[in-house]
């Protein structure tokens, strides 16, 4: 060696000593760092926990800042190296690269590491801890090796019993649940509450009505309440309509249920007929008046299978049924029909004989009212009665006072052939269709004053009488046939048979009908002549009049009459 090189070497010796000491201090400093990383060539890098001066990891289950001994017992499956301490691996190539970059001469002259350092830093792969906790591919190394980072995959060397303590309550729950299931299997299965019987089940429409409107609702739903209720009501109506349609179709297919259903009372023209007006019960009445109620009931029970003979209103009721049949042919869903109600003060025990007689003649009478000796007049308005026909004049007068069109039925003295295809109804004018104001003048002042009065008030309509409403009902049904071009074949025909003179007092009558909007098919002005011969030609099913001598005259010719007890003529009869 030359002297110059020796001089340079001597000059660099202090620097070499300085570099060795710095390397030892740097190694010791790296071992004390909490962020030291384990790295091997081709393996995954994991962050290390805090270490002490000897290089062992300080483990703490709770605070992660202070060192405390673990309370859990070691597991059999755990390796011994994990139960003691984790030894930090020697600095990796990145650490040596920093020292090697100082000068190549330093690597040549640097002595090997001491044995004390080997005891704290081991590089043997046999004692190296397992770095992969899960079967996942290795992650690339961090770009900043000196920065601290926390990973979700912590080293398994932290407390090995932490997961067992967390899972123990869950295991106890599963064990208790399995025990409870096993215990329930052996126990008898009993129901703690009674089963709801099917009779208590109700559809939604009924259950909805049980709850009031006090339920709190959001403001946006409150505004839609009426519309929603309207939609629900419409849906319910559609369901009901479909149900009744299916029921009617079912009944039409059954031969025994082929009879038409009765119309709804609020639309129908209700005709209330007593049992003595519908059937001939003269002999039965004599037994009641002569022998009393008990004998009368015994007689009815004994003869309940004996069919009663037709009474004065029998043919009138048959003609009403023919009109209903014609209306149903033209209007299948028609509700403006005649509805016959049997209204009688007979007892319920007599009802069996009445039902047998009604069915025998094929009368479509579905509603009965048997009052058991009590007057049935109080039920007339409840049945929405338009016309009441009875053989008892006292009950008819009661009904007239109640404002219900009523008449007392009388049979003809001899049989007469009646038309079966057309309902024919004849009316008297004064005190029947019209009021009795004109009769007051005729009775008090004579016929001359009567004619002058009618001429003077020709354009003034007459006041209505008790049967005017029934004529309106007939006219309403007639218009239904006229709408189908059935005027000439209409099954209803009305007649006006009056003792007035057409020349002197007939104009006011016709103008009054015109003002009311009513049509009369035939108007017969007799000028005081008897009505019997005219009625024989008409052959009406019923003739309404307020004077008994006209009733008696018509009876002699066989006409079925109905006396209307209304007006001044009742005081003179």
Curated annotation (Swiss-Prot):
One of its GO terms (molecular function) is nucleotide binding. Expressed at highest levels in testis. Also expressed in brain, skeletal muscle, kidney and heart. The active site is at residue 428. Its cofactor is Mg(2+). Keywords: Cytoplasm, Hydrolase, Magnesium, Nucleotide metabolism. GO terms for biological process: allantoin metabolic process; amide catabolic process; AMP catabolic process; nucleoside metabolic process. Its EC number is 3.1.3.5. It is an enzyme of class 3 (hydrolase). Residues 93-105 have a biased composition (Low complexity). Belongs to the 5'-nucleotidase type 3 family. This is Cytosolic 5'-nucleotidase 1B. It comes from Mus musculus (Mouse). The lineage of its organism: Eukaryota, Metazoa, Chordata, Craniata, Vertebrata.
């Amino acid at each position: 060696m030359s002297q110059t090189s020796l001089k340079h070497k001597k000059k660099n010796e202090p620097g070499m000593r300085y570099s060795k000491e710095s390397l030892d201090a740097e190694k010791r400093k790296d071992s004390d760092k909490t962020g030291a990383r384990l790295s091997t060539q081709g393996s995954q890098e994991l962050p290390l926990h805090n270490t002490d001066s000897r290089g062992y990891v300080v483990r703490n289950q709770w605070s992660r800042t202070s060192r405390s001994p673990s309370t859990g017992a070691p597991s059999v499956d755990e390796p011994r190296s994990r139960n003691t301490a984790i030894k930090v691996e020697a600095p990796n190539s990145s650490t040596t690269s920093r020292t090697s970059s100082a000068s190549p001469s330093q690597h040549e002259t640097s002595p090997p590491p001491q044995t004390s350092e080997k005891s704290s830093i081991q590089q043997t792969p046999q004692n190296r801890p397992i770095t992969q906790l899960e079967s996942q591919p290795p992650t690339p190394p961090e770009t900043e090796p000196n920065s601290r980072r926390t990973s979700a995959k912590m080293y398994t060397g932290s407390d090995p019993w932490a997961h067992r303590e967390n899972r123990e309550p869950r295991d106890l729950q599963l064990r208790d649940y399995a025990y409870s299931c096993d215990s329930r299997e052996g126990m008898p299965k009993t129901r703690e509450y009674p089963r709801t019987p099917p009779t208590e089940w109700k559809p939604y429409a009924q259950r909805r009505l049980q709850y009031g409107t006090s339920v709190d609702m959001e403001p946006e739903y409150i505004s839609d309440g009426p519309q929603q209720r309207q939609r629900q009501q419409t849906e319910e109506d559609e369901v009901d309509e479909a149900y009744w349609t299916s029921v009617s179709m079912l009944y039409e297919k059954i031969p025994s249920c082929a009879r038409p259903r009765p119309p709804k009372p609020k639309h129908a023209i209700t005709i209330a007929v007593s049992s003595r007006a519908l059937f001939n019960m003269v002999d039965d009445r004599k037994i009641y008046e002569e022998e009393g109620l008990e004998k009368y009931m015994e007689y009815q029970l004994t003869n309940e299978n004996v069919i009663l003979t037709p009474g004065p209103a029998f043919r009138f009721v048959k003609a009403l049924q023919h009109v209903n049949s014609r209306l149903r042919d033209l209007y299948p869903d028609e509700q403006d029909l005649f509805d016959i109600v049997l209204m009688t003060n007979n007892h319920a025990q007599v009802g069996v004989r009445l039902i047998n007689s009604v069915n025998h003649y094929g009368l479509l009478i579905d509603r009965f009212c048997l009052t058991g000796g009590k007057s049935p007049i109080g039920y007339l308005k409840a049945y929405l009665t338009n016309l009441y026909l009875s053989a008892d004049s006292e009950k008819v007068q009661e009904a007239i006072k109640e404002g219900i069109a009523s008449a007392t039925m009388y049979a003809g003295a001899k049989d007469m052939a009646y038309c079966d295809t057309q309902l024919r109804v004849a009316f008297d004018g004064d005190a029947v269709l019209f009021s009795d104001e004109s009769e007051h003048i005729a009775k008090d002042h004579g016929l001359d004053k009567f004619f002058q009065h009618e001429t003077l008030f020709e354009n003034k309509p007459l006041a209505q009488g008790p049967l005017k409403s029934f004529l309106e009902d007939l006219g309403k049904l007639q218009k239904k046939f006229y709408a189908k071009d059935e005027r000439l074949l209409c099954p209803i025909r009305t007649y006006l048979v009056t003792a007035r003179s057409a020349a002197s007092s007939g104009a006011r009558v016709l103008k009054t009908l015109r003002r009311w909007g009513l049509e009369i098919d035939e108007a017969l002005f007799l000028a005081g002549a008897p009505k019997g011969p005219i009625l024989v030609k008409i052959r009406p099913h019923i003739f309404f009049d307020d004077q008994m001598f006209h009733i008696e005259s018509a009876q002699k010719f066989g006409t079925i009459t109905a006396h209307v007890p209304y007006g001044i003529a009742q005081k003179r009869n």
